């Protein structure tokens, strides 16, 4: 679905992403893992065409990702994107946030209602919450609304930027299970950003561990644990292991 060929990105003098070439597996969940500022979200925005590459190119279905106009909009209709923190419009209700793109594309009311009902069932969202504004929803409910909005057009790809960030541990644990079930049920290509090692291992078919704009190691969590390629990988894993007599921590 996606292929990156020598893609890089700078913000002024800061090299956010060094030249990177990789292919993302279709129908699988790839997790971008690493500490804050390592380039995870930058890479996700490049995949969605929200940022232009400084060098190289991003291929989508074997063709260069368009950079503007109707061609880019057409690709984005096939790519569901959920921003960190949900990115919901505060002046719209939950239902209005979810159905915004469908209304812009002039879907029929019947088609919109049918799709919305299926998403409410899929995400286990309380239907009475659809009439509420984001400020009236819990953190977990806002994340479910953001996920439904990303799925509204039945995209081929899901790009999720820290979908479980800033949630309390119990809600986070519940949503992790729901996300894994949803990914398995839908069989879509998913690219998910997180800094949490356990979450990456639980949700990902493959992990790209990043540091300072580079992919340091790629593989399943068991591969990273058993065969770390350098001291950074070892330290990153160890930093997220539970402390003796404690509940664990995060890098």
What are these regions (language model features)?
Residues 154:
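Conserved catalytic motifs of ABC-family nucleotide-binding domains
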Residues 212-213:
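Conserved ABC ATPase "signature" C-loop
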Residues 110-128, 181:
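Conserved ABC ATPase "signature" region
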Residues 133-137, 141:
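Conserved ABC ATPase signature
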Residues 65-80, 104, 227-228:
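ABC ATPase NBD coupling module
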Residues 48:
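Helix-to-loop junction immediately C-terminal to a conserved catalytic motif
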Residues 218-219:
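ABC ATPase "signature
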